[in-house]
Amino acid sequence: MSSVAVPFYQRRHKHFDQSYRNIQTRYVLEEYAARKAASRQAAHYESTGLGKTTCRLCARRARSLAHEAMQESRKRTHEQKSHASDEKRIKFASELSSLEREIHMARHHAREQLDRLAIQRMVEENMALERHVVEEKISRAPEILVRLRSHTVWEKMSVRLCFTVQGFPSPVVQWYKNEELITPASDPAKYSVENKYGVHVLHINRADFDDSATYSAVATNIHGQASTNCAVVVRRFRESEEPHPAGIMPFHLPLSYDVCFTHFDVQFLEKFGVTFATEGETLTLKCSVLVTPELKRLRPRAEWYRDDVLIKDSKWTKLYFGEGQAALSFTHLNKDDEGLYTLRMVTKGGVNECSAFLFVRDADALIAGAPGAPMDVKCHDANRDYVIVTWKPPNTTSQNPVIGYFVDKCEVGLENWVQCNDAPVKICKYPVTGLYEGRSYIFRVRAVNSAGISRPSRVSEPVAALDPVDLERTQTVHVDEGRKIVISKDDLEGDIQIPGPPTNVHASEISKTYVVLSWDPPVPRGREPLTYFIEKSMVGSGSWQRVNAQVAVKSPRYAVFDLAEGKPYVFRVLSANKHGISDPSEITEPIQPQDIVVVPSAPGRVVATRNTKTSVVVQWDKPKHEENLYGYYIDYSVVGSNQWEPANHKPINYNRFVVHGLETGEQYIFRVKAVNAVGFSENSQESEAIKVQAALTCPSYPHGITLLNCDGHSMTLGWKAPKYSGGSPILGYYIDKREANHKNWHEVNSSVISRTIYTVEDLTEDAFYEFKIAAANVVGIGHPSDPSEHFKCKAWTMPEPGPAYDLTVCEVRNTSLVLLWKAPVYEGKSPITGYLVDYKEVDTEDWITANEKPTSHRYFKVTDLHQGHTYVFKVRAVNDAGVGKSSEISEPVFVEASPGTKEIFSGVDEEGNIYLGFECKEATDASHFLWGKSYEEIEDSDKFKIETKGDHSKLYFKHPDKSDLGTYCISVSDTDGVSSSFVLDEEELERLMTLSNEIKNPTIPLKSELAYEVLDKGEVRFWIQAESLSPNSTYRFVINDKEVENGDRHKISCDHSNGIIEMVMDKFTIDNEGTYTVQIQDGKAKNQSSLVLIGDAFKAILAESELQRKEFLRKQGPHFSEFLYWEVTEECEVLLACKIANTKKETVFKWYRNGSGIDVDEAPDLQKGECHLTVPKLSRKDEGVYKATLSDDRGHDVSTLELSGKVYNDIILALSRVSGKTASPLKILCTEEGIRLQCFLKYYNEEMKVTWSHRESKISSGEKMKIGGGEDVAWLQITEPTEKDKGNYTFEIFSDKESFKRTLDLSGQAFDDALTEFQRLKAAAFAEKNRGKVIGGLPDVVTIMDGKTLNLTCTVFGNPDPEVVWFKNDKALELNEHYLVSLEQGKYASLTIKGVTSEDSGKYSIYVKNKYGGETVDVTVSVYRHGEKIPEVNQGQLAKPRLIPPSSST
């Protein structure tokens, strides 16, 4: 037997070979094989019989043998089946018992394993708790016990940096080189890291010159972090091995790929332009560059400069050059990044460069009104525990002035910033003390003004707190054979214990708030580390005060604060080491705290000159006192706005600056202020106002030179004017010609040509000529155009017309444009009948004809163009002979509307003149506004007048009429194609004519037409309000065509300030029906308004007037200011209330209902002005007419409220709303009749609109389901509940605006419990109804005189008839002649006592009971003797029964 235990899940699996896969199949196969064998045997016999002659006996015998063999085979097969079945049964029984044993063993093992796991888990939890307690006790943040030490080593030496740190959990240590993480895996030959028992070591193998850096170690765990750093300086062994300047090699080396000695041709395909950005954004300046030839391993050097300072890859800037692009990316913009950026492509052939200015605006302040962030934070004069931080102040153009700065420091590798100064420092320089030697720090600065604190500046470059003198305290000694020995000066000083005093104590920085003292360490100084103590004394005091008594200074620098302003001080310094303190140094000269650097004076005269369409050049004179200037800030303002904006956000050092981002055509003024460390100068005087326009230059060259006609001796040329006139009007053109294949050009005209068409005379027939044209303005003559095609001087005789010329594109919009041209000079043999316009996209070859039929106009609007595509156009003239020559192809036109495109607008001026107006901000002094009608220049001065002022132009219509309808256009020269058109149709002209007529013939505008209002006394006021009325305006009222005058009946007045004219009629009667008109005149302006008061309108105002008069009279005595109204309180009470006024003590107030007075518990307090009547628990009986009356000697008033009908229903709805909010959840109450669902409310009335629902079906009240309620409850009675009554029940009460639902799920256990309780109560009620009981007849006490006969009779009841037994003193009464008992008709029971004696006194009881129970009634019998006083008995009290429960068998 194998010793290996079989798993439980494998023991349950049964394994069979092929023979046991299916026993039944195996038996079938065996039987089939036997039959097959018998069949073969029989066939064999038959075949044998065919071959031989066999007798019948032999054949019968053979068949008998075969039959026997078959029977034997069947018998054997049956026995095998029976045997197999027995084996199978035995096998299954054995396996079942084995399976039961295995299951039992598995359960046992599982129970043991579960117990083992429970015990193990308990032990682990206890151990974890104890471990957590222990860890909490020993947990602490990292603490550095031994810090890193700086090293100065020679090249090729190894450096071992080590420090000790403790903390729990064990800190994770990371090493940094100049803030970059050191990963030993990246350079395993250079770095290796060790950690043994908290001592961490960084090995730097074979240090070279590049390993000089600041190394930091940062230890971190979950409780905090700590860091230490040091400096490693690697020096070369020989001075001759210092690296040579670039390009000077002492021996031949492979040249670097960055050194370009191959000639390249560099072209800038796309340059970066002036850019505006905001602090905190990311930005990339890009230039597309074409370098020829393009070599993979050799290319030009791309250098980026900011204000002529080379930019290198850093945390803030990323450089890229490749794939035809040079890019400079800014990861996080700050104002430090503002400046003039230049990209220089350095090649052998020279330098190609492009420049543009980057402006960086302040980010949004965290606090409104706070200043911008300072910039350019730098560190100077770093030492062991001291550094001076400087910065540049922000420009505060629109903010309050800066009152000081806060300086923050942070140790490199950490993120916790610490504020260095408690009070804001006034100047842009601050000495930071208290640094830890060997650590590296970064700094930032925040500005403060009266509004708050600015955002922090960009952090400074890291600076290490090291003494630079330590590196100089080594000395080189030259020995024979060229060897050198490096020794430290400490080794030469001998054994010095107490150091000498410092020397050369002086003030290196003096300001109003502090003095920085500097000194030289003592010589000799000794080998022990030195510290210093500083003492000060006010001149004349005679006493010395130690400044740093608590903390010694390690650096030979110290900033002394807390000095009295204006008082001179002297200072001395003492050096100290572990052996003692030196003598004091020599006393300094008296030093007085004061600002050495003063605020600069204001810059001088500021001059602004034109530069481009969006920029202006600003120049100024430098201030008289410009010492220690940081630079200048320039501000600009739109003339008249008085709002100044900063032009630059970082001080510039030169006195000429180009201000960008200005709006074309706007006028600006400029001012400049100087800035240094102390602050800002006063603003300079403002410059003269200047309009932003491009500077005056020579015009650009003409283009599109076309031959328009030729007669064999002369040629007529046409051309297009230059795109840009240079800022001043073009005075004319100069033409040069030359014959083909000639070198020299010849002047055609000596004087300027004012038009763009000219006929060149004295030409040779059949010769070829080319021409070039130059334009001239006041600045000079511009560049000539490119030479034209070669034109042959041969007379034109073709019948078709010549080419159109001067194609001009205007009104370019997103999907359309307008094409203009001039008629051909050569018309052909017949007049021109029209023109065909063709166009195509630049990249296609097929031309498209825009108009199927020739147009007779010399303009055409081309539509259905694609936005963003570029097209070219040409025009062909047509006459009777056919289509003539095509014009020159126009310049490519990009179809897209320019941003800010403006259109012609129509209007009417203050004098009523109709005009068309246009505004063009891009217009310059040289621009002309050219108005046209149907694209023909307007020259008719009789019908039109043109006025142009600055960038606005208007076309006035002198005598507008229908002949002025049409299309008007305008184009502005010397711009980038600014043009527009306007269709003046009949509807628009009519609108303008109407508006013009209103202005020329003015009407007084009215705020409101003539209206009326009825005043409190029944007076009627008629009034009208105009927009405004002058004091000289006149008015009059007309009633039924008769003017009325101001008097007692008609009081007429006018409020000129508000424009109100009114007339008040004291008594308005039936005679006043008619038409009312008011007429107003104010200068030339007139207006009137009428009001018709007849028929129903008059009756309405008359009725209202009478009503107001009655109301006025009513209010003269006590009256109701608010008549009776009702409201529902939170307690579901109805409150009838009214408000009263003008009462006095004698005023009487009463309540009535249906004419009868109502008695109230407390008389109302009329002084409060309110009276209330409470109706609790409202019902139908409270319906009626309620009335309140007020009366005194001045009169009386009545208010009535009919509380019935709709009013009653509204109150019920209001009660439903208040009561519905207090509805409780549905509750179940079981009774003998069934199950009752109840909802309790503050108030319930059966007239409230409520519904009960079962399974979302509304329930109607009936025998099965009864709906009812009481004063504070609504219920649903389910009689004889069954299973069908299960489900959700909903009670909903409706108010006027909302409803309130309560739901109960009567199913499951809730229904079962309720049904059981109902059945119990039903049975109890049935038993109570049918049990045996005494209905009445027996008194509580009976008194009788002895000798009398006592008869106690009562009526009993029970179903079935009860058993009746009498007792005396709780014992069964023995019946005899003295005691007689009878029961008649099963319900009348009596006890007769004959001859009563005193012994018969006692308690008698009657016991009545059937199967449902019964009761016992006690009667006390008192017998007295003759002559005794009769005992007092309370008469009329019946005996109280005692219940008897039913027998347990019932």
UniProtKB/Swiss-Prot annotation:
Gene3D superfamilies, sorted: Immunoglobulins (2.60.40.10)
Stretch list, region Disordered: 66-87
Annotated GO CC locations: M band
The UniProt record lists the keyword Repeat: yes
Pfam families assigned: fn3, I-set
Domain of life: Eukaryota
UniProt record, GO biological process: sarcomere organization
Translocase among keywords: no
InterPro entries: FN3_dom, FN3_sf, Ig-like_dom, Ig-like_dom_sf, Ig-like_fold, Ig_I-set, Ig_sub, Ig_sub2
UniProt note on tissues of expression: Expressed in pectoralis and cardiac muscle.
Keywords from the UniProt entry: Immunoglobulin domain, Muscle protein, Repeat
Ranges for domain Ig-like C2-type: 142-233, 254-359, 899-995, 1002-1115, 1118-1204, 1225-1322, 1333-1422
Protein function: Is a structural constituent of myofibrillar M-band in striated muscle.
PANTHER family linked to this entry: MYOSIN-BINDING PROTEIN H (PTHR13817:SF49), TITIN (PTHR13817)
Full protein name: M-protein, striated muscle
Lineage: Eukaryota, Metazoa, Chordata, Craniata, Vertebrata
